Swiss-Prot record:
Homodimer; forms a complex with YhaV with stoichiometry PrlF(2)-YhaV(4), possibly as a YhaV(2)-PrlF(2)-YhaV(2) complex like the MazFE complex. Antitoxin component of a type II toxin-antitoxin (TA) system. Labile antitoxin that binds to the YhaV toxin and neutralizes its ribonuclease activity. Also acts as a transcription factor. The YhaV/PrlF complex binds the prlF-yhaV operon, probably negatively regulating its expression. Residues 12-59 form the SpoVT-AbrB domain. One of its GO terms (cellular component) is cytoplasm. The lineage of its organism: Bacteria, Pseudomonadati, Pseudomonadota, Gammaproteobacteria, Enterobacterales. This is Antitoxin PrlF. It comes from Escherichia coli O6:H1 (strain CFT073 / ATCC 700928 / UPEC). The gene is prlF.
Length: 111
């Protein structure tokens, strides 16, 4: 454990920083912050002494563009229900056939 670690921590965990400066947020941290992959954002505060405070952005940090898009979709579905079709799972499987996805892999420059 680092010498400057907080003594009142409930749990400690670590992650490695990639050559691109990225890291995977450890599962216990994601669970503690109730992070939803692809939806939530994280706020960082750099404190004196080189420590960093990290927390999940709350609802006050809404994504207004995404919310506007979702309202548009909702209105379109309500106003044009005849255009709404069920998702064809077989077609979806064809679209992703042969794709190998590992959520623990690093994200490459071309992705």
């Amino acid at each position: 454990m680092p010498a400057n670690a907080r003594s009142n921590a409930v749990l400690t965990t670590e992650s490695k920083v990639t050559i691109r400066g990225q890291t995977t947020i450890p599962a216990p941290v994601r669970e503690a912050l109730k992070l939803k992959p692809g939806l939530d954002s994280i706020h960082y505060e750099i404190l004196p002494g080189g420590q960093v405070f990290m927390c999940r952005l709350g609802d006050e940090q809404e994504d207004h563009t995404m919310n506007a898009f979702l309202r548009f979709l909702d209105a379109d579905i309500q106003n044009n229900p005849q255009k709404t079709r069920p998702f064809d799972i077989q077609q979806g499987k064809k679209l992703v056939a042969g794709m190998d996805v590992n959520i623990d892999d690093e994200i490459g420059d071309d992705e």
